[in-house]
Amino acid sequence: MTETTGVPAAAALSVRDLHKTYATGVQALKGVSLDVQPGDFYALLGPNGAGKSTLIGIVSSLVNKSAGSVEVFGVDIDEDRDGAMRLLGLVPQELNFNMFEKPRDILVNYAGFYGIPRAQALLRADEELQRAYLGDKADAMSRTLSGGMKRRLMIARAMMTRPRLLILDEPTAGVDIEIRRSMWKTLREINAAGTTIILTTHYLEEAENLCRNLAIIDRGVIVEQGPMRALLSKLDVEGFLLDIDGPLPASLPQIEGATLQAVDDNTLDV
């Protein structure tokens, strides 16, 4: 809707009172609510097991919710699942493409699943490979790409449908800082071109470098949310505790603007 109607435009993502309880009895989400505005770069920050991937799975219709509502640009995922899914692209944490295909073929074949004509798909594939800094790898075997290149290929594939909302689940997990920064560059360019981006991460540095708004989730509950700078200022004063799966490392990482202190073997004071 336009501003002249007096009605605000729909949020890129609107989540209301979202619950998820698995068959095992585990409550992964406990009444999560949040809004992501069009054009935003938004982070879901939290430790492993906090509920980030479950939330993304529900939004992407890969996981069934127990209760609550989800809308993508005003389209309810229960009322019009296909319509909502056409508006978003998903980059999962796992590499899930054929390593024996060429990058261009991976993108073109993916576009075909969405009914995009081959001639148009070929043009888009070249555009997305260039944007992902993979133009010179279009005809290489995907298995020969570096780890960072493979992850950028996943982003290029998701962008083939021209989604208005791009969701990335732990896109830089397990990669070194140089690969991480190369991916940040690609994501900034995509966001600058108008695509709303949501990423899950447990790296505070990543959220701080990329995102304008942030929600901190722990044990299925949003514990803080709001503008990045305001939350960082608040955390400078208040701090927060993160429960970590498994023992903390002997040497804690250094994060600019934050002090990390081990409370016990599984709890980190930030």
Language model region names:
Residues 141-145:
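Conserved ABC ATPase signature
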Residues 166-169:
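Catalytic Walker B motif of ABC-type/P-loop ATPase nucleotide-binding domains
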Residues 184-270:
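ABC transporter nucleotide-binding domain
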Residues 68-76, 83-84:
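Conserved ABC transporter NBD signature motif
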